[in-house]
Structure formats: structure tokens, C-alpha cells
A protein has these predicted regions:
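Bacterial N-terminal signal peptides
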Residues: 1-9
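Secondary-structure edge/capping motif, primarily at the C-terminal ends of alpha-helices
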Residues: 82-89, 108, 112, 147-151, ...
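A cross-kingdom marker for long, charged
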Residues: 206-256
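N-terminal Sec/ER secretory leader and immediately downstream segment
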Residues: 16-121
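Long, amphipathic, charge-rich alpha-helical segments that form helical bundles/coiled-coils
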Residues: 69-80, 101-108, 112, 161, ...
Length: 256
């Protein structure tokens, strides 16, 4: 799930715009759930029009959290920020994010698995070797998931995935909102994935944190905006999803 949610290796610039975006062609299937691959989604956005990715780079320092579920959510958002910084070719931001990923991974007990990847990310960013940075970010996600599953922390692994999906959706809707198109909005048509996350959150009653409840409530708000059958997702719905995910993104990175 983690690799599927965060793999943001992007298509070449200047490719021909697609006649129509078919979300199923930009997806993989995880646990019988169609998971749109962000590398394909962001590549499709590039094809639909130029994107100023530097506007979406976020490198603010986060507060120190002690709750492992909170750290897992934050780790997901920071890994997603890493892919966005790569797309913007912002070497200082990528190097900073590499260090933050390592610190957060240590906070949930998987730092040893991430250390070599963090070093490789920083080295590749120094050389502006963006293909290698993407590859190491992808390996980071896989290592996080594998390490968590080995110690039966699957729920934390799911929160990492959720954090990344929320951040990716925040950026996706921000881009589409600025230059609305039906094809861009169609990239939000992910009702099965939303249901997947809702189901997983319902099974996390032991994580009794305000941010978890806020996300649960927010997903209820988002669902009718994107679960619309064969209809088109409207510009107003894109705006609302952006407002919701932006609010959650701010809540994830700040103290309660």
C-alpha cells in the first residue's frame, strides 16, 4: 500500500495531453482496492497543463510528537512532501525532508531500516540525480511498510499510507482547482480507496487521538463529493475536497 500511495516518479514533460483520463489505467490493486498510483496521477496532471510544483513544496519543521499513530501520519505526509520536492527539483528541500523522514522513522521504531535510504536520498539530491532520489524514496516506503509488518504494526503502516494519501490529495486538488478541467477532477474519483481507509480507521479504536477522529469525520465529508458514479466531479467539489484536506494537513502537523 505505501509504495502504491506514494510512488511519484513522473512522466516526461511535454507529452501529449490524453484524450481522457481513465483512473483505472493509472492504478494498481491492493487488497481488492483500486489504488491510483500518484506517479501516474501527477504525470497526468503534467500532461493536462504546466504545474508550478515549487508552490507546493513544504519544508516547515514539525513539532515533536510522542504518540506513534501521530508520528505515522506525519511520516506519510513528509514522504509525500519529498516526492513533491523532487518534482520541483528543490535539492535543499529534498535533503531536509530526508533528515526528517529518518527522525520520524526512528520515532516509530523503524529508523534502522531507513538510515541507508535517507543517506542515499541526501547524496542523490546533492548530485541533482532526481531519478535516484525517487528510487530511494520508493525504497524508503517499502522498507517502512516491511519493518512495521514484521513487528505486527500493520495499523501504523496504514496510517503512513493515509497520511501520504491526504497530502497527495491536498496537492492534487490545489493544482486542479487552479486550472480546472474535467480530466483533472476525474483523478479524484477514488471512492473504493476512501472506503478502504474508513474501514481501517474504524478498526483502530485503540488510537483514541483527536486527529484520528478528525480524519474519520473529514472522510465522511469527502465521500459524497467523489463517490458520484458516472457523473463528473465538479469544480466546487474539488474546492471543497481541497479545503478539507488542507485543514487536515494543518491539523496533522500541529500540536493539539
Amino acid at each position: 500500500m505505501v509504495a502504491a500511495v506514494f510512488g511519484l516518479a513522473l512522466c516526461a514533460h511535454g507529452a501529449q495531453a490524453p484524450q481522457h483520463v481513465n483512473i483505472n489505467q493509472l492504478s494498481t490493486t491492493i487488497e481488492d482496492v483500486v489504488v491510483p498510483l500518484p506517479n501516474e496521477l501527477f504525470g497526468a496532471l503534467n500532461k493536462l497543463g504546466a504545474v508550478s510544483w515549487k508552490e507546493h513544496v513544504r519544508s516547515d519543521e514539525e513539532p515533536n510528537f510522542t504518540e506513534r499513530p501521530r508520528i505515522a501520519l506525519l511520516l506519510g505526509t513528509v514522504i509525500a512532501d519529498g516526492f513533491i520536492a523532487v518534482q520541483a527539483e528543490d535539492a535543499p528541500a529534498v535533503k531536509d525532508i530526508g533528515q526528517r523522514v529518518l527522525a520520524l522513522a526512528k520515532g516509530i521504531g523503524v529508523g534502522n531500516s531507513i538510515t541507508p535510504h535517507a543517506k542515499a536520498i541526501i547524496d542523490a539530491a546533492d548530485k541533482r540525480n532526481w531519478a535516484n532520489v525517487r528510487q530511494e524514496l520508493d525504497r524508503t516506503q517499502n522498507s517502512v511498510q516491511q519493518a512495521m509488518n514484521e513487528v505486527h504494526d500493520e495499523k501504523l503502516s496504514q496510517l503512513v499510507s493515509l497520511g501520504g494519501w491526504l497530502r497527495g490529495t491536498e496537492v492534487l486538488t490545489s493544482v486542479v482547482k487552479q486550472h480546472f478541467s474535467n480530466d483533472g477532477a476525474e483523478l479524484l474519483h477514488q471512492p473504493d480507496l476512501l472506503t478502504y481507509f474508513q474501514t481501517r480507521l474504524q478498526a483502530m479504536s485503540e488510537f483514541n487521538l483527536p486527529i484520528v477522529h478528525q480524519i474519520q469525520d473529514a472522510l465522511v465529508e469527502v465521500k459524497p463529493l467523489i463517490n458520484i458514479g458516472n457523473a463528473r466531479i465538479s469544480a466546487e467539489s474539488v474546492k471543497k475536497v481541497n479545503e478539507i484536506t488542507t485543514r487536515l494537513g494543518n491539523d496533522i502537523v500541529k500540536k493539539d
